[in-house]
């Protein structure tokens, strides 16, 4: 999964839920500091800055420190899914989607959508673009890579 895919999924979620969460002024994204969502990943941060301006909502990135994979909620969910399909042959997209939609995690069923977009890898920004992104980001001095704010700036015509 690329950083562009992560932001596309966030944008998709925001469009679907914006009316319900309209009073919200800041989204807090709880992230695991993986390679695609790292706060120094320039493409990820540029896409988030652009999202903030389009959505007119601030974003706070709250990262977990390194930990064992069994402590990661997403990986626990993956383990539950593996138990649910119990060695079944996943030879068709319909089988994968069916098992995933039917699993139960935290008393609910996941929303399953197939993403068919092909994302480029190795996307980089120019030095000037990186500086423009970093100028829009507020890092807490003692928590530089663990807590990052991207404030919405009314009237800013950011275009990344």
Describe every region a protein language model picked out.
Residues 44-62:
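Two-metal-ion acidic nuclease core segments, chiefly of the RNase H-like superfamily
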